[in-house]
Regions:
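Macrodomain-like recognition of ADP-ribose-binding/processing modules
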Residues: 1-160
């Protein structure tokens, strides 16, 4: 079941936070930057994972560490070079990544997930196009899914 909330996703009480990234993402803007600052080990492990496994857009990778679990949904094209910015997101990649998220939730036995407005910041997609796709994959889940449709830094959302 999805509950739309407003607030700071980093303050979520959900077992995992899901957000959109690109393979080999630099985590230098938006929510990714905040996650990099909050969980520096996650970013280091993410870079290692990308170098070892070369994930493709549409995949998902979960990181578990002290303080939380972060689900990285590969919704964007990778950067063309080591120093360039990631490519744009696509609704096809969002579809595939959400399918992988549902599998991860089941495999990991997660009891709640917070998810950001996927692919609409750096990814460049329109929220009105992405939101129904999120609902199509996650609305039927039997666990709470907190959709952070509006971000307000420092504000704890009313998840319950």
């Amino acid at each position: 079941m999805i509950k739309e909330v407003s607030g700071d996703i980093l303050m979520s009480q959900a077992q995992a936070i899901a957000h959109g990234v690109a393979p080999n993402d630099h985590f230098d803007r938006g929510l990714a930057l905040s996650l990099r600052e909050e969980f520096p080990a996650m970013y280091k492990d993410f870079r290692h994972y990308c170098q070892q496994f070369h994930p493709q857009p549409g995949a998902a990778w979960i990181w578990s560490g002290v303080g939380g679990r972060i689900i990285n949904l590969f919704t964007q094209e990778p950067p063309q070079t080591t120093h360039s910015h990631p490519g744009r997101a696509s609704i096809i990649h969002v579809n595939h990544a959400l399918r992988e998220l549902v599998k991860l939730i089941d495999k990991e036995g997660l009891e709640s997930v917070a998810i950001s407005r996927l692919a609409t910041g750096v990814g460049g997609l329109d929220w009105e196009e992405v939101k129904p796709v999120i609902y199509s994959y996650l609305a039927s889940l039997l666990i709470p899914v907190y959709l952070y449709s509006n971000f307000t830094k420092g504000l704890k959302a009313a998840e319950k």
